[in-house]
Amino acid sequence: MSTKKRILFFTKDLNRTGAEMILFNIVESLDRSKFDIGIVLMQQGGELVPNLPEDVNLFYLESTFTLFDKIRFHLGEDVMLNRLKRIENEFKSDIWYINTIDNAYLLKYRKHFSIKTCLHVHEYLYNFEQIASQEIILLIDQADQVIGCSVLVEKLFKRLLGNKYMTFQSAIDTRYIDRCLTEITPKSGNKKRIISSGTLCYRKGLDIFLDLSTFFNDTNVEFIWLGKWPNNGYAELLKNKIKAGEFPNVQILDQLNHQEYYQAMQGADLFLSCSREESMGLVMMEAIYCGVPVLATDSGGSSLIVNDQNGKVCFDFRPETLSQEIKGLLNKSFEKSAMRKSISQYDGELEIQKLEIILSKI
């Protein structure tokens, strides 16, 4: 009888963002007759943590350092390595599965353990500019398997890595969405509702979203963003501009639970993605599944998902042009079953089967 492989997943926090939700779905779906699973989080308090299966071993890797830690480091002790050793001594993994390029630095510790390594890349070019060159060198030299989230990422890495690369097409958990939508809350009021979702950041185009809202100040259209504020200057500036009343028909909803999130999504008349760059774009897929047409800027990933069955990709980022596209789509009807069929090629169960084969062979 074959021995089960022990996989230790590393990820940021299991909050409800695209990369974290994909990782959660993988952890939840892997065949327990083939794999034992542990997960290491860099931060506590993730929204998905309470929903982890009971058989998952949960660890926290402290990423901050006290004054005493810094003194020990200057005396020659590798504090982070010792923290990893404590986790590894308890779990005794065969594979480290590292989620997102931000955590690629963990690959430098692999030489201290008898493990294989996987790195799951959800990011695209903009994100690579934000990390050190050493992280890419580690990806190339130290990852036994690199897993990309879309064909866009595949184009970046396939020729470079050869058989060390595979694409795991990101997909949404439609069964979970269905459970969240068993009770539908009717939309209040008669305003047209335009929704966006994701971290309130420059890459996601929050500034474009806000500028667009001003074209509808004297209409019955409201703009709602579902997402959390990061702690940076860009977010702080725009948060204060909203508080000052510059964007009167914009709401930021950052405290919704999962059911409230999907109900808000389904209650929209249009989903608006203003992203400057996406490697995929799961929130657009969620909107389409909920029967909400999508207007998306040409972010890369949007062209993989959005078509004339479910919305439109706009190749002009100017708010004047986008505002006209919004008006056009608000007056156009879409058929929900055709919308869902338009994204049916993104099959999460099939992707899990492919991933299990890779993990079994590594």
Language-model segments: residues:
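Glycosyltransferase donor-sugar binding loop
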Residues: V40-G46, S197, E222-E236, D254
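Short, structured helix-loop element that forms part of the nucleotide-activated donor/catalytic region
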Residues: P50-N51, I224-P248, E260
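Carbohydrate-associated surface elements
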Residues: L152, A171
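Short alpha-helical donor nucleotide-sugar binding micro-motif in glycosyltransferases
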Residues: Q255-L256, Q263-A268
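Short hydrophobic beta-strand element within catalytic cores of glycosyltransferases
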Residues: M284, P293-A296
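Conserved acidic donor-binding segment of nucleotide-sugar-dependent glycosyltransferases
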Residues: D308, K312-P319, G328-S333
